[in-house]
């Protein structure tokens, strides 16, 4: 694990740079106060069971395999850095990767639901990404749905397809489905006056797709590169987690 000890400060340093250099901007996370209170509360209720189960899973993981703590921190830092990158969007807001695919492959979707939510909380507090009232909605899309999509792809394809392709699809589609859900959340809260939910969903989805599809592809490629590096430098830990069991490089 020595190489990871060298990488983790780099990832954390990049995160700190983003924190201190970030400027006010609207992010693809749903911003503070944007959702009506009823919907904001609804998404907290929906995501709460995942947090409870995820915390239990993390406690068992750390108790049984304390050597994985560094990888947990690395996965969280990776998600923080990627999801904090802001790229201008056609709406005057910004788009960003999600970074949840890697942690999901390593630890599963329940663990990532907690890590991703912690990332979102820190972003809301430190760099004005998202918000506290919209944390439930943002956590459901980025920290729950995205990771579960990545997990289904990983579990379904890792024994049937080249591992690089499986990692790419897991990361890229987790990113895309995050914004499909975000579009649905916004459409539910603000249906079109004429076309209702469907028209509003199509409008939000079309806006997000302009920047999010290229970002998802880029995130998939980057996640493959990082995963390959982990295979080379942390193979024992990956085997201990069951990540490489039955997978062919």
UniProtKB/Swiss-Prot annotation:
GO molecular function, one term: cobalt ion transmembrane transporter activity
Pfam family, one: CbiM
Broad class of where this protein is predominantly found: membrane
Signal peptide residues on this chain, from the entry's feature table: 1-27
Pathway assignment: Cofactor biosynthesis; adenosylcobalamin biosynthesis
One Gene Ontology term, aspect cellular component: ATP-binding cassette (ABC) transporter complex
Entries under HAMAP family matching the protein: CbiM
Keyword field contains Cell membrane: yes
Annotated transmembrane regions: 33-53, 70-90, 102-122, 134-154, 161-181, 207-227
Location(s), subcellular: Cell membrane
Cited InterPro entries: CbiM, CbiM/NikMN
Family note: Belongs to the CbiM family.
Function: Part of the energy-coupling factor (ECF) transporter complex CbiMNOQ involved in cobalt import.
Single GO BP term: cobalamin biosynthetic process
Membrane disposition: Multi-pass membrane protein
Subunit field text: Forms an energy-coupling factor (ECF) transporter complex composed of an ATP-binding protein (A component, CbiO), a transmembrane protein (T component, CbiQ) and 2 possible substrate-capture proteins (S components, CbiM and CbiN) of unknown stoichimetry.
Matches recorded under NCBIfam families: cbiM, PRK08319.1
Domain of life the protein comes from: Bacteria
Keyword field: Cell membrane, Cobalamin biosynthesis, Cobalt, Cobalt transport, Ion transport, Membrane, Signal, Transmembrane, Transmembrane helix, Transport
Biological source species: Roseiflexus sp. (strain RS-1)
UniProt name for this protein: Cobalt transport protein CbiM
Keyword Signal listed: yes
């Amino acid at each position: 694990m020595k190489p990871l000890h060298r990488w983790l400060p780099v990832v954390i340093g990049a995160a700190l740079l983003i924190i201190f250099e970030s400027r006010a901007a609207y992010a693809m996370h749903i911003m503070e106060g944007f959702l009506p209170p009823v919907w904001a509360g609804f998404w907290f209720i929906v995501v709460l069971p995942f947090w409870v189960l995820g915390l239990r899973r993390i406690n068992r993981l750390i108790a049984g395999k304390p050597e994985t703590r560094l990888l947990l921190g690395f996965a969280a830092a990776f998600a923080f850095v990627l999801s904090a990158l802001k790229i201008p969007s056609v709406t005057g807001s910004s788009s960003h990767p999600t970074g949840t695919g890697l942690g999901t492959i390593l630890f599963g979707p329940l663990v990532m639901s907690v890590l991703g939510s912690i990332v979102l909380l820190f972003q809301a507090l430190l760099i004005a990404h998202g918000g506290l009232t919209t944390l439930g909605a943002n956590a459901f899309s980025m920290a729950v749905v995205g990771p579960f999509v990545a997990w289904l792809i990983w579990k379904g394809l890792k024994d049937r397809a080249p591992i690089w392709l499986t990692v790419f699809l897991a990361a890229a589609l987790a990113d895309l489905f995050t914004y499909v859900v975000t579009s649905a959340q916004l459409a539910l809260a603000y249906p079109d006056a004429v076309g209702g939910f469907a028209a509003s969903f199509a409008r939000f989805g079309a806006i997000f797709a302009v920047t999010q599809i290229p970002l998802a592809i880029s995130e998939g490629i980057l996640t493959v590169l990082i995963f390959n590096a982990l295979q080379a430098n942390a193979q024992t830990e990956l085997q201990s987690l069951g990540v490489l069991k039955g997978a062919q490089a």
